[in-house]
Amino acid sequence: MSEFLPFSRPAMGVEELAAVKEVLESGWITTGPKNQALEQAFCQLTGNQHAIAVSSATAGMHITLMALEIGKGDEVITPSLTWVSTLNMISLLGATPVMVDVDRDTLMVTPEAIESAITPRTKAIIPVHYAGAPADIDAIRAIGERYGIAVIEDAAHAVGTYYKGRHIGAKGTAIFSFHAIKNITCAEGGLIVTDNENLARQLRMLKFHGLGVDAYDRQTWGRAPQAEVLTPGYKYNLTDINAAIAMTQLAKLEYLNTRRREIALQYQQALAALPFQPLSLPAWPHVHAWHLFIIRVDEQRCGISRNALMEALKERGIGTGLHFRAAHTQKYYRERFPTLSLPNTEWNSERICSLPLFPDMTTADADRVITALQQLAGQ
């Protein structure tokens, strides 16, 4: 059998090794100059005013919700077809996640679904830029402005995604992820961008014990050795080891995403003759980052179920992913919201399958996946 082809693999090279070595030899390995450089680079990439690096996108979501004073009695609108960390953070703060349906073919939350879910208790809206494509953020942001509700963009899949000519996160507040499978990675990490100066100040405090400054800031600017706690906070800062890797990856972003697009195009062309259904692309002008390439496997149409397809691909040495099992179908949320029905979400959650997609894949790797799909479709 051929070597196992994983669903994803980080594209690491000698540049990342050199970046880590530089930090280790510098004597400053926790939050420091590499963090500052990463934050500045994301301001430049997105065009936004403030960037706050954190230990994960989940940490970023947690403190953003906290900074917006979301808590008991509040509601936060989000799709169910997302990673559960968003729902978990809302719930842990005592608020209620209001899960809404998505478009059946793009899997994007729609402005109409969001607006229909608004109540006097709605405190925030969290749209997801799904799989590397952008949601219709202008329309969603307009709803937030009309009702006076904060919009927090889940941009975990969207490093390199553009909407109407502007990078995701160009305005408002957005949260990116640097997890191991993301378009750029530093193993674990995240970053928040915002154009709200007061929010940025609160986020910097909340990510580091509630202090007004961090250790590097104190050393650099000669401030008092013991900073003062301004509010209870967390330990969500990113180390310079991670930031250095992220910076190196960011310098490669154009190449990394170009390679993803090439593989995605190869899949698209082959799937045109197969019963497996890829996602539709959004109608608005955009640049897709191709974080994921997802097909829908309908047993009646394809002659095989999604789970059986994933197992058959595994037997052929090909890994796959599931992004995502709908949150409202998982035990805790199923029991908390027993009557919730989201037809488009449920139909897709039972059928979606993420194919291997990462920059170091070869054309032959993609051909191997395509050949396996052809065989499993009986062609």
UniProtKB/Swiss-Prot annotation:
GO terms assigned for molecular function: pyridoxal phosphate binding; UDP-4-amino-4-deoxy-L-arabinose aminotransferase
Gene3D superfamilies in UniProt: Aspartate Aminotransferase, domain 1, Type I PLP-dependent aspartate aminotransferase-like (Major domain)
Modified residues (N6-(pyridoxal phosphate)lysine): K182
EC number: 2.6.1.87
Gene Ontology process terms (BP): lipid A biosynthetic process; lipopolysaccharide biosynthetic process; response to antibiotic
CC cofactor: pyridoxal 5'-phosphate
Pathway listed: Nucleotide-sugar biosynthesis; UDP-4-deoxy-4-formamido-beta-L-arabinose biosynthesis; UDP-4-deoxy-4-formamido-beta-L-arabinose from UDP-alpha-D-glucuronate: step 2/3; Bacterial outer membrane biogenesis; lipopolysaccharide biosynthesis
Keywords: Aminotransferase, Antibiotic resistance, Lipid A biosynthesis, Lipid biosynthesis, Lipid metabolism, Lipopolysaccharide biosynthesis, Pyridoxal phosphate, Transferase
Pfam families noted in UniProt: DegT_DnrJ_EryC1 (PF01041)
Listed InterPro entries: ArnB_NH2Trfase, DegT/StrS_aminotransferase, PyrdxlP-dep_Trfase, PyrdxlP-dep_Trfase_major, PyrdxlP-dep_Trfase_small
Family from the record: Belongs to the DegT/DnrJ/EryC1 family. ArnB subfamily.
Record's function text: Catalyzes the conversion of UDP-4-keto-arabinose (UDP-Ara4O) to UDP-4-amino-4-deoxy-L-arabinose (UDP-L-Ara4N). The modified arabinose is attached to lipid A and is required for resistance to polymyxin and cationic antimicrobial peptides.
UniProt protein name: UDP-4-amino-4-deoxy-L-arabinose--oxoglutarate aminotransferase
Protein's organism: Escherichia coli (strain ATCC 8739 / DSM 1576 / NBRC 3972 / NCIMB 8545 / WDCM 00012 / Crooks)
Lineage: Bacteria, Pseudomonadati, Pseudomonadota, Gammaproteobacteria, Enterobacterales
